[in-house]
Amino acid sequence: TRRLLDKTGLTVDDIALFELNEAFGSQAVYCIEELGIDPERVNPNGGALAIGHPLGVSGTRMAGTLLRALDERGEQRGIVTMCVGGAMGAAALVERS
C-alpha cells in the first residue's frame, strides 16, 4: 500500500475507502495502525472475516465490494489490498471518474 501511494503521489488522506483483506483480525489492526488509516474507512461493509473470502475469487469479491461502497457514498478513490502466499501482498487503486 505504501509503495502504491508513493508511485501515485497520493497519501492515505487522499483515499476515501480501503478494502483490506484481513485473513486475521490482528493483521488488519496492524495495517490500519501502521498506515495511520481511520478505521471507519476500512472495510465499511465488513471484510473477509464478516463477508468471507471465497477461494480463488477473493480479489473479485473485494474489488466489487469496494466499487459498490465508493458508489453508494459518492466517493472517488479507494484502495483494495490482497494477501498473496509467502507473506506477499498486492494493492490496487480504484478511481471513479
Go through each PLM region and give its residues.
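Claisen-condensing/thiolase-fold acyl-transfer catalytic domains that form or cleave C-C bonds
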Residues: 1-97
